[in-house]
Amino acid sequence: MIKKISDAIGKYMALIVLAVAALALFVPSTCLWIQTSWINYLLMLVMFGMGLTLQLNDFVMVFRRPKDVLLGCAAQFTIMPLLAFCLGKLFRLDDALLAGVILVGTCPGGTASNVITYLSKGDVALSVGMTSVNTLLAPFLTPAITYLLLSTTVSVDVAAMFISIVKVVIVPIGLGFVINKIWGKYTQKVAEGLPIISVTAITLIVAAVVSHNAQRIMETGAVVFVIVILHNLLGYLAGYLLGVLLKLPVPKKKALSIEIGMQNSGLATSLAGSAFPNLAMATVPGAIFSVWHNISGAILANFLRRVE
């Protein structure tokens, strides 16, 4: 029964998140009870769930095909930050929105990318390998790249960002991984209900950010939506074209496209709140990306699965 509910929620995740985001935007009073201070804890819950699904075999891929994984990771932390920076400057965003967009770009790949790669008939092993390594590199690369791109605009506390990523991402994933390693036969049963927990947590994060910034989103939202959509779609395109340039097999092209285009926008939202507490609107791009990339990911999977 739980698995059926989880499957249904996972299938309609994009619609659920979109509906809640719309409610929070147009009737913010319905979601103001969800505090923005909960965001870190909700993201920790999602990351813990990700850890429960990881196994040693997921990391074996890194050692068997290090070139593929490292190439993908290098592309991830180069293409998306530069796209974010260029789009932010092109649209002349204010400091808060620029910080938020760049944080989306400098964060690692999204946790849903593995599922989208599977649905696209892409190289799932490469996708999982990239997600795992990108996430482990995030405490070092996300603050460093953010500092390089933003230091002349706003103050960036690199040490605070490092600590926040370790606390919110690495520790929960590591704890989940260890528990899965020790009590695997029990965690497999728990894993059936993880989509329910993850979707609920992500939905609450989006609702909190949107409802508490509804007025400002209504004033500047159109520009942010355009940038988020362009950032995501250009990321997909750049990832696929990189695969074409390197003459990779089609499944690898699909994995690269999805891994590069989809970002851990929940982490971007969390970091925006902790790293830039005086820039409230910095949390908005991550929240909008959370809504959009679930929609675009589903559409892309439906398209790419037909590409042979």
Model segments located where?
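Alpha-helical transmembrane segments of multi-pass small-molecule/ion transporters
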Residues: M1-E308
